[in-house]
Each structure stands twice: as C-alpha cells, then as structure tokens.
Regions:
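Acidic, gly/ser/pro-rich intrinsically disordered tails
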Residues: 1-5, 9, 16-26, 37-43, ...
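Short secondary-structure capping/turn segments at boundaries of alpha-helices and beta-strands
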Residues: 14-17, 57
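Extreme N-terminal targeting and regulatory segments of eukaryotic proteins
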Residues: 46, 50-55, 66-73, 79, ...
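Short nucleic-acid-contacting surface segments enriched for D/E, G, S/T with interspersed K/R
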Residues: 55-70, 155-170
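Flexible glycine-rich surface loops and low-complexity tracts that mediate binding to linear polymers
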Residues: 65-79, 167-180
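Generic beta-strand structural signal
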Residues: 66, 83-85, 106, 131
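Short, structured interface segments
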Residues: 74-100
C-alpha cells in the first residue's frame, strides 16, 4: 500500500463530471496533468485522477485548461504496467494563475517488502552515514499481481533484524519524484521505519513476488 498526503498544482485535462458513489453520494471527478523533469533531463507528463465533493453545478467550474491546486490523499498503484495516481480531496480546490508553478509535494506512507538486495550502507560526500534500499508494494489486478517499487534513502541508519532483505516494513517519509528515461520514479526520504505486521489479506498479497 502506498498512500500519500499531498498538495499538487497542474492543469485540468478532462472537464469535471458528476458521479455517484456506491453509498449514493454525489461527487465530481476530473483529471489533471503535472509535468516532471528528471535528473537525466527527460520529462514525464503525469496524469492524476481527482475526486472531490460536488455535483453537476459545481463540476461546471472545473473545465479543461484551468490551472488548479488540490490537497488530499494520493493513492499510487500499478495497473497493466502503468503507474496510476488517484487523489481524493475533501478541501476546496484553488484556481490559479498560469504563472503558478507545477508541483506535487507531500508525505508518503508505505507498506511493503524490501527487495532481495537488502540494505546498502554508505557515507555521504561529507562522510555522514546513510542507508538506501528498494521495496515494493503489491496490488491484485484480477488474477494477476502488479508491483510498485519505491527507492528509499535513510539519513539515520538503523541496524535491526526487521530492516533486511525480504522483510516487511512500514515506512513514513517525504515523497520525492524523479523521472528516468521518461518514466516516473517513486522515491522517499525516510522519517521512520517499523516492522509491518501483516493481516491475512495483506499477507496473501505481499507473498507475491515480482519476476
């Protein structure tokens, strides 16, 4: 599971529509795009699906081409090998001038499994001890499983049994995004790490392994 609390600014690409939830409550839904430039100079235009309180009347305000800022809970998952970002907000969405910069910033809550490569300890250029590792979250798509990878950097190294290859962890930290060869890369600057105690459903999902 990858859940983030974020604020994002971008341009609406598909005008808002009124929809109805399973509970019979009305809400509006639209998509927006936020471009990211990677360290390698490549660019990724990332689309974000946004859902917010509203109805057909308020949906008319959110037309394609308008620049907006929205804050809420962002869910990240894979489907058919593509990364999807879905934002749910309960707060007012701001309309912005064209000069307002694109952005997507916030915090990440991650639950998943550390890769078989385990933990890498190293020193920064200034000689400060650090750690890096990769971990994945799995989502079931029909009969198949999809895996979303996150790269973590830990500035306060931990040497515990639960922080090792193939261990399940819950990580909280700052969401960081990069682009490599035109593909979005998920990164996180760690604030806290703890062992993840799986329930039966989560365990069934987590036991699946990426090829």
């Amino acid at each position: 599971m990858i859940k983030c609390n974020v604020t994002t600014c971008g341009v609406i690409t598909s005008s808002a529509e009124e929809k109805t939830s399973k509970e019979g409550e009305k809400f509006i839904s639209f998509s927006m795009v936020v471009p990211f430039e990677g360290k390698d100079g490549t660019v990724k235009e990332q689309y974000i699906s946004v859902s917010a309180p509203g109805d057909a009347q308020s949906a008319a305000n959110y037309s394609a081409g308008r620049r907006v800022t929205a804050s809420g809970v962002l869910y990240i998952r894979k489907h058919d090998s593509s990364t999807y970002l879905n934002l749910r907000t309960d707060t007012n969405i701001e309309f912005n001038e064209s000069t307002t910069p694109d952005r997507l910033v916030g915090s990440m809550e991650f639950k998943g499994k550390i890769s078989k490569k385990g933990i890498k300890d190293f020193n920064s250029k200034k000689g400060k001890p650090m750690q890096s590792f990769s971990a994945f979250s799995s989502d079931k798509n029909g009969e198949n499983y999809e895996f979303t990878w996150v790269s973590f950097i830990n500035l306060s190294p931990i040497h515990e049994e639960y922080l090792a290859a193939d261990k399940y962890v819950e990580v909280h930290g700052d969401l960081q995004l990069d682009v490599f060869k035109g593909e979005l890369q998920l990164e996180c600057k760690v604030k806290s790490i703890a062992p993840w105690e799986l329930n039966k459903t989560a365990e069934a999902n987590a036991e699946q392994q990426p090829s």
